[in-house]
């Protein structure tokens, strides 16, 4: 009996040790994952970024701003520093993704700006031009600002903007439109010609008018033929 009790006690001890080892291993894994996440996560920064698309202001942020292919969108930024230290804005870039799936289709060419030294609670205003060389469709525009805080470089995402590339209106002097007009006028001219010709062929010929003899009895002899 004591032998079986001893075996059971040893089994419980081994099982407890195994569970403790698993728990410690899991704890180490969780800590390692947290360390990795902290290492790859972008540094947080308390910066408020607002911008307007010049000439395309809209009160409804859910509506699409309309552009034609190869139009240039001018972004007017208004940036406020809520950090407890000065920061410097020195660059802008960004990306364009499809709506609603979010597939990247283009990068916004990076550009150097400023640099703008922003004090605590300070505000800076500047602009950025983005060429929309895209096919027709609906997209998200997602700008990023590049800033430095001490010796740390941070990338600040601005709010996305919905926009749509639409087909341009057809000009009256567009060659394609002119060709359509020529064909249309040719059809109308041909139909009119054959209609008038058929009406002419169906018109009855005039009968030769009979010459009536004029009563000349009342005329003086001098005027009679």
Curated annotation (Swiss-Prot):
This is Increased recombination centers protein 22. Residues 191-225 are cytoplasmic. Keywords: Endoplasmic reticulum, Membrane, Signal, Transmembrane, Transmembrane helix. InterPro entries: TRAP_alpha (IPR005595). Is probably involved in a pathway contributing to genomic integrity. Residues 1-24 form the signal peptide. The chain crosses the membrane at residues 170-190. The gene is IRC22. The keyword Disulfide bond does not apply. Coiled coil: none annotated. Residues 203-225 are annotated as: Disordered. It is a single-pass type I membrane protein. Residues 212-225 have a biased composition (Basic and acidic residues). It is found in: Endoplasmic reticulum membrane. Belongs to the IRC22 family. It holds the Pfam family TRAP_alpha. Its main location: endoplasmic reticulum. GO terms for cellular component: endoplasmic reticulum membrane. Residues 25-169 are lumenal.
